[in-house]
From Swiss-Prot:
Record-level GO BP terms: tRNA pseudouridine synthesis
Pfam families per the UniProt record, alphabetical: TruD (PF01142)
Gene name per UniProt: truD
Taxonomic superkingdom: Archaea
Name under which the protein is recorded: Probable tRNA pseudouridine synthase D
Length: 411
C-alpha cells in the first residue's frame, strides 16, 4: 500500500488516490448502439477528444461547421481533463472532414435516422491510471465493495463544479428566486476566487473594464457581463448562456439534495435495504434502471423485493426532487421532507414560470450500483459503468480521491 497518507487517515488506512495528473490517464469511451442508415437524416461522428469540456467542444464544432450549436447534440457530458471517445449528432448538411483542431480527432462517421439525446447510452467504459495505492489494495477494496452490494450511487464531485465547487449553491439561489444573487455568485465567489477582476466587477459593476480584464477563455462569464452592459441588471442574465448550461445549476442543486438524502438513507437503513413505501426499478447488467416498470414496495412484497435486490435484479430509487417528484411515502420520506424544510424549498419551486427553461420536473435515481468487468493491473483500473454513474464516486470508495481536473470553466 502507498505511504501517501494524510495525518488523520493513517488510522483508517485510506490512501490518497490521485487521478488525472495527465488527461490521457483518464479514458472514458461511450458504449452506444446507434443504428446506421446510408440515407439517414443525421450525421453521427465518433470522436476522440482530449482535454476539452463537452460544451466548449460543441461550440468549436459549431463554429468550424458554421452552424448553430443547437444543431449539435450528444449523449453525455464528460470531464474536461480526460481522453474521451464520444458521439455527436449533427442535424445539418455539412462536411465534417473540415473538423481539425488540437485535441480532437474523428474516429468514425456515419448517417443515421436516430437523433442523439442526453442519456442515449448503454454504458461508459473507463480506463484510469491512478497513484497512491497498490493494485492489491484496490483489488481487496473492490472485493469488499462487491460483498457489500456495490457502492453508493452519489452524484460525483464534478457535478458541483471543478475548482469552483459552487454550482449547486448557484442553483439553490435560482430555485429560491434570487436570480441576481445567483449571477453574482457565479461571477465571484470569495470562497474560491482569487482573481481581482472577478471581485472588482462585482464591487464596481464597471462592465467595460471587466470585458477588458476577464480572459476570453471565460466566455460564459463574459456573456453575462455583456448582458449586464446591455440591460444594466443581472436579472435574466442566465438567458445569455446556452440553455443546457443554465439548467445545469438547477440540476446540480437537485443532485446536492439527492446526495444528502442518500447519505442519511445509508446511515439509517444501510445501502440496499428496501422498506415499505419505497420505489424500486428493475436494472440491467450495467445497473441502468427500467423506469417504465416501477415496483412499489409494501408490507406484503418487501421480503421478495430485498431478495431481488441481493440478486441485482432490482434497486431502490430515491427521488431527485423536482416539480413532479416529491418525497417518498415511506418512513424515510419524513427525513426527505425534513431536508427540504432545512433548505427552505419545496417541489413547486422547481417549476419556474418566470424562466421556464430553468424548470426541472425531477426524476429518480437508484441508490447503488456495481462496476462491470472490473480489473486492476499496473496501477490502471479498467471497468464499465451504466449511464449517469460516476467513476469518481466508485474510486472514492477505495480511498480519498484527489482529482487533478481543477481547471475553472465556471462550472
Amino acid at each position: 500500500m502507498s505511504s501517501t497518507m494524510s495525518a488523520d487517515q493513517s488510522n483508517r488506512a485510506r490512501p490518497v488516490i490521485r487521478i488525472k495528473e495527465n488527461p490521457e490517464d483518464f479514458t472514458v469511451e461511450e458504449v452506444a448502439d446507434i443504428p446506421k442508415s446510408d440515407n439517414g437524416k443525421y450525421t453521427i461522428i465518433k470522436a476522440e477528444i482530449i482535454d476539452w469540456d463537452t460544451n466548449r467542444i460543441v461550440e468549436e464544432i459549431a463554429s468550424a461547421l458554421r452552424i448553430s450549436r443547437k444543431r449539435i447534440s450528444y449523449a453525455g457530458t464528460k470531464d474536461k481533463r480526460a481522453r474521451k471517445i464520444q458521439y455527436f449528432c449533427i442535424n445539418a448538411p455539412v462536411d465534417v472532414s473540415v473538423l481539425a483542431f488540437k485535441g480532437f480527432r474523428i474516429i468514425d462517421r456515419f448517417r443515421s435516422d436516430h437523433y442523439l439525446r442526453l442519456g442515449d447510452l448503454t454504458a461508459n467504459h473507463f480506463r484510469i491510471r491512478f497513484q497512491g495505492a497498490s493494485d492489491d489494495y484496490i483489488e481487496q477494496r473492490y472485493e469488499k465493495m462487491m460483498e457489500c452490494g456495490g457502492f453508493p450511487n452519489y452524484f460525483g464531485q464534478q457535478r458541483f463544479g471543478s475548482r469552483r465547487r459552487n454550482t449547486h449553491d448557484v442553483g439553490r439561489l435560482i430555485v429560491t428566486g434570487r436570480y441576481e444573487d445567483a449571477v453574482r455568485l457565479y461571477l465571484y465567489d470569495e470562497r474560491y476566487d482569487i482573481e481581482d477582476y472577478r471581485r472588482e466587477f462585482i464591487e464596481t459593476l464597471d462592465y467595460n473594464r471587466a470585458l477588458e480584464k476577464f480572459p476570453r477563455t471565460l466566455r460564459f462569464e463574459r456573456s453575462i457581463i455583456g448582458y449586464y452592459a446591455q440591460h444594466h441588471t443581472f436579472k435574466g442574465a442566465f438567458d445569455a448562456l446556452p440553455k443546457n448550461l443554465s439548467i445545469m445549476f438547477v440540476h446540480a442543486y437537485q443532485s446536492y439534495l439527492f446526495n444528502r438524502m442518500l447519505s442519511l438513507r445509508i446511515e439509517k437503513y444501510g445501502l440496499n435495504r428496501a422498506i415499505p413505501g419505497d420505489t424500486a426499478f428493475p436494472v440491467d447488467r450495467y445497473f441502468n434502471p427500467d423506469k417504465s416498470r416501477p415496483v412499489e414496495v409494501n408490507e406484503v412484497n418487501v421480503d421478495t423485493i430485498n431478495q431481488l435486490i441481493e440478486r441485482d435484479r432490482l434497486r431502490v430509487a430515491l427521488p431527485i426532487i423536482g416539480s413532479e417528484v416529491g418525497p417518498d411515502q415511506s418512513d424515510f420520506g419524513e427525513i426527505e421532507k425534513k431536508i427540504l424544510e432545512e433548505e427552505h424549498v419545496d417541489r413547486s419551486m422547481f417549476r419556474n414560470s418566470e424562466y421556464p427553461h430553468l424548470s426541472s420536473t425531477g426524476d429518480r435515481r437508484i441508490v447503488s450500483a456495481k462496476p462491470v468487468d472490473f480489473s486492476v493491473s499496473n496501477s490502471v483500473m479498467d471497468f464499465t459503468l451504466g449511464r449517469g454513474i460516476y467513476a469518481t464516486t466508485l474510486i472514492s470508495t477505495f480511498g480519498d480521491l484527489v482529482d487533478f481536473d481543477a481547471e475553472s470553466d465556471g462550472f
